[in-house]
Swiss-Prot record:
It is a lipid-anchor; GPI-anchor. It is found in: Cell membrane. One of its GO terms (cellular component) is plasma membrane. InterPro entries: Variant_surf_glycoprt_trypan_C (IPR019609). Residues 51-72 form a propeptide. This is Variant surface glycoprotein MITAT 1.1000BC. It holds the Pfam family Trypan_glycop_C. A lipid is attached at residue 50 (GPI-anchor amidated aspartate). VSG forms a coat on the surface of the parasite. The trypanosome evades the immune response of the host by expressing a series of antigenically distinct VSGs from an estimated 1000 VSG genes. The keyword Isomerase does not apply. Keywords: Cell membrane, Glycoprotein, GPI-anchor, Lipoprotein, Membrane, Trypanosomiasis.
Length: 72
């Protein structure tokens, strides 16, 4: 996931970024360009984003659950 994020950050155009995820057949795209959110810096600027933070968040929750089971 880190390599994908790095490649996505290096992409300069939307087509280049979209191609990062097309190498895998039957899988979703790894990254995409989207506009920033309100309250963030430069909300109108398109930025290359990927979903790897969701994987990291899910992994952190799994580790937390596992550690809480060890407490019993």
């Amino acid at each position: 996931a880190e390599k994908t994020a790095q490649a996505c950050e290096e992409a300069e155009k939307a087509t280049k970024c979209a191609r990062q995820g097309t190498g895998k057949t039957g899988d979703k795209h790894n990254c995409a360009f989207r506009k920033g959110k309100d309250g963030k810096e430069e909300p109108e600027k398109e930025k290359c984003c990927d979903g790897s933070f969701l994987v990291n968040k899910k992994f952190a929750l799994m580790v937390y659950d596992f550690v809480s089971l060890l407490a019993f």
